[in-house]
């Protein structure tokens, strides 16, 4: 049986590990290092360089060197090299191909299967893009696993049978995740996860670069941001300074011949950066990790004191300020020092590959979906079918109905996010279920099923229960979340909670009013057209007509109070109409079962049908 590897495809560095005799081993690359820079360069002679060789020549080949491409996964970002546009998947595939080659060289055999990790907070498009990168690299991706989950798997397998609660704080080069997991008796279960897909060591580097640019401009009057080669040298110096400040109180940044002045005289950059100054200019970045941490504790429903172990993952957690913050937030608990933050994710991925290949027994990995999933229903409401932090794989179904009479098709629009109003969430994709037989609104039953596989990738099916006709979409080719979208997604849900609740209530009231008007209008029409004429006086029907007209007028406006008032009045008149019919029927001594049972004429819908309607949306979504 072919071997499977575990790969941590990182923003700044990547790692590959494999099981040897049941134990995970991190594979050194062809340069002898256990981590490979996630950098790809296209040399002028046509050669493609990957890893450390690509990083080494970046200063002299700035425009043709690509780094931190993970931040663009799942988006429509491309980079043009020699008139060819490269997608993030293609660039990532180059890194994966190198890791694959290095592992094959180590094992002496071909490798086709891999488990690849992603940040827990990656959305569907980003996960799909990662899987595609693996396929481009010639790998059969057995599973996409969340990085904190892989880390917990690597950390917790040898910790005995006792159930433990573990907090994984994962701050890498470009992404941040925090997850709470329970481990015991071979089961690794994720309780909650949160994060920020655009927060990582790169941001700390950028702050040092900005600081150096400002310092140099202050002394020489020259703006280095206009010089690409100088900026590349600053970036490399900033990364080196950041690493040095993890063990030293200050560091010297010395860059000779950084640029020239107006008279072509060479200029030197020589600055001293202290740890205190570094922490001051990056304090706001550090503070951005607090909210996801608090969110995870809240979602898991536990107290900070219930955490048994804290595991730090990602090279950026080596910064003393990060370690101190984690210690502060966990009530003084010392983070575990027994894992290598650069390698633990790849080790966990290799273990999961072993589980899937049958090499590792009695281990069950239960992961969760990081964001809620649902569809847009009438009134622009987000009707959630799967809530965030639901264990995956999972499958959920709900039945919806049509919004208009004789509606021939429904547009199913799939969203991911936490806001009550669908448009405020991330549109993952849409598809149409056609061929619905002509029927009054509320009669067709459309069953919508969400199926999330173990990779966190979404499949959606819509089925007309009446005809058995169905349509399925596998959500892919997403545009990815922009930085603004990913940062705002959950915090917007909290900031706008009241506004969203109000919008949802308004949509619900409007839906109820429209439904009551429709059903009552239909019933009045049936009474007037009944054989032998209506059983109730015309003035009773006229009162109902008047109430219907008032309700329609209210619905044409935006005053929810007026709609509620008109709905109450219509309800009263509808009840009076039902009572009059009942009394007339009793007087005629007719069999009162069928006619009397539908006194208000407004309850023909199936009780199993969810009280929400799929919107027939002809307008192009912006």
From Swiss-Prot:
User: Which Gene3D superfamilies does the entry link to?
Assistant: 1.20.1270.10, 3.30.420.40, Actin, Chain A, domain 4 (3.90.640.10), Substrate Binding Domain Of DNAk, Chain A, domain 1 (2.60.34.10)
InterPro entries attached to this UniProt entry: ATPase_NBD, Chaperone_DnaK, Heat_shock_70_CS, HSP70_C_sf, HSP70_peptide-bd_sf, Hsp_70_fam
Pfam family membership, one:
HSP70
The record lists the membrane-crossing segments as none
SUPFAM superfamilies this protein is in?
Actin-like ATPase domain, Heat shock protein 70kD (HSP70), C-terminal subdomain, Heat shock protein 70kD (HSP70), peptide-binding domain
PROSITE patterns (alphabetical): HSP70_1, HSP70_2, HSP70_3
Report residue spans for region: Disordered.
588-622
Q: What induces it?
A: By stress conditions e.g. heat shock.
Q: Which residues carry this modification: Phosphothreonine?
A: 175
Q: Enumerate composition-biased segments (Acidic residues).
A: 608-622
Q: Does the keyword Cytoplasm apply?
A: no
Q: Which UniProt keywords apply?
A: ATP-binding, Chaperone, Nucleotide-binding, Phosphoprotein, Stress response
Q: Quote one Gene Ontology molecular function term.
A: ATP-dependent protein folding chaperone
What job does the chain carry out? Acts as a chaperone.
The entry assigns this protein to a family as follows: Belongs to the heat shock protein 70 family.
* The name this protein goes by in its record: Chaperone protein DnaK
Give the gene symbol: dnaK
